[in-house]
Amino acid sequence: MKITIAPYTDANATEITDLHHACVHAISPTIYSLEQQEAWAHTPPNYPYWVKRLALKKPFVAMVEANIVGFIELEENGHIDCAYTHPAYQKHGVMRELFAYTQNVAQKKGIKRLYLEASIVAKPFFEKRGFVSLSRNEIKKNGQMIVNYSMEKILS
């Protein structure tokens, strides 16, 4: 499977929005309840919100053939805001490729620190890539408490 990383275009907005929704709702309800998943990613998705968000964030997009299989957002200050892989492509190296690309871009820009808020399911991925957990957070989102972890990685 050949994974390519492409810049975001406005034509990607609906597919990325659907990917985000599918990712959140594919998490086992033993990790995040169905109510927490719905608070995190409404059904149906809020497409106008995501169109505006993605136009501002300009994520890096992972493609397999013509299909969007993942995306990651890197802000100028080193914050990674979103990092998602389509459920059908998880455990196939998509996020590994996206993260390696993102880290390379960050280093070329002179960013010294990457930081993020990782979900329970994403935390092990980032730990394997040198991130350390700074705190466990309980975030209230749409009436639900959602656990995530503030993490950082110092770049050399």
List the predicted regions and their residue ranges.
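Short secondary-structure boundary/capping segments
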Residues: 50-52, 72, 106, 140-143
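Acetyl-CoA-dependent GNAT
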Residues: 7-10, 18-88, 99-101, 121, ...
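Conserved GNAT acetyl-CoA-binding A-motif
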Residues: 106-118
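Conserved G/P- and acidic residue-centered "switch" motifs that form tight phosphate/ATP-binding loops
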Residues: 93
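Extreme N-terminal starter segment of soluble prokaryotic enzymes
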Residues: 2-4
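Conserved catalytic-core motifs of GNAT/GCN5-like acyltransferases
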Residues: 115-117, 132-150
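Exposed loop/turn and edge beta-strand positions of beta-sandwich/beta-sheet ligand-binding modules
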Residues: 56, 79, 112, 145-147
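Conserved active-site tyrosine of GNAT-family acetyltransferases
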Residues: 126-127, 131
